[in-house]
A protein has these predicted regions:
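N-terminal secretory-pathway/extracellular module detecting exported/lumenal segments
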Residues: 23-141
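N-terminal signal peptide c-region/cleavage motif recognized by signal peptidases
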Residues: 18-22
């Protein structure tokens, strides 16, 4: 795994671990205006893939701003595959970091995996609310 991918995974896991656990029946909140503007600017600049992104949640502290997005849910024999996007900016740094990862939800197992550089699926760091989020991800109309 490259250092860039490793640092993105660690950053995303840290952000997500800091977010409060969701209750059963979790669903994403509407995308706040500040995140709409940030995402649109990053898409327009080419830093983030220009496609429809579903806002999942965000963390805003004095040290860090991080937003989590999901796009392109597709049902597969293993569950649901999707693209995950992380927008990250640390205090004192003007530029945003954008990380996009291919992921999948293993619906029956209530867990997430990410596609590693060697095209192998590896378990994604879990949190208390992973099962609720997997249930939402797997609920494709």
């Amino acid at each position: 795994m490259s250092a860039t991918v490793r640092s993105a995974v660690v950053a995303l896991a840290s952000v997500l671990a800091a977010l409060p656990a969701a209750a059963d029946g979790w669903s994403p909140a509407p995308e706040p205006a500040v995140w709409v503007q940030t995402r649109q600017q990053l898409q327009a600049s080419g830093a983030m893939t220009d496609r429809p992104w579903q806002f999942m949640e965000a963390l805003e502290t004095p040290e860090l701003m991080a937003g989590e997005y999901l796009s392109g849910r597709t049902r597969t024999s293993a569950g649901v595959e999707f693209d995950a996007g992380l927008l990250l900016r640390r205090n004192g740094v003007e530029d945003w970091q954008v990380r996009e990862l291919r992921m999948r939800a293993l619906c029956n197992q209530q867990r997430l995996q990410r596609l590693a550089g060697d095209n192998q699926w590896v378990d994604y760091v879990g949190r208390d609310d992973t099962a609720s989020k997997v249930a939402w991800i797997c609920d494709i109309p």
